[in-house]
Amino acid sequence: SSEEVPEIPEMLENVLLFALDEAKEKMEEGAELVPFTTLVVKENLFIESHPGDSSEECYNLAQHTVEGARGADAYAFCYDGYVETDDGTKDVIIAEGGVPGAKDGYAVGYLYTVDDEGGYTFEEEAAYIGEAPNFMAKLKSGVDYGEDEIDEKYLTEVDEDPSTGIDTDGE
């Protein structure tokens, strides 16, 4: 689309793309994609699934998790969805996210097709979808919270995944 792609903060862009790649991998392995959030807290990445009976319930669970994530610097909320295009409705894995205190968040995604055998073909490049709600709009920057204000689950030491340099604890 002709929509102008904004400058997305680098950390946020990395988290959004990480979430999309995680989702893509799950789907290629034939697993169901349960909506999940990834949160960056002090160099660590926390992944939490948000299974629900409806997309609305998943959304509310994700929003609740992120709004309570004091000390986090960015998040992504990733789910399987669709977008309306000039060529009709397209399947897309969507990651939307934001950073503390910003009015708006951003949504990016991988468009994909499914063949008759159930095999997925994903677009090479993530596409910018548009602005999204920012669940972190009311949070302060991560460094503005003292250790005592940050949920303990985000302060534990975690194992770093050497291949990405991104911590993968909290799956």
Model-found features: residue ranges?
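Solvent-exposed loop and beta-edge segments used for protein-protein assembly and interaction
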Residues: G30-E32, G71, D87-T89
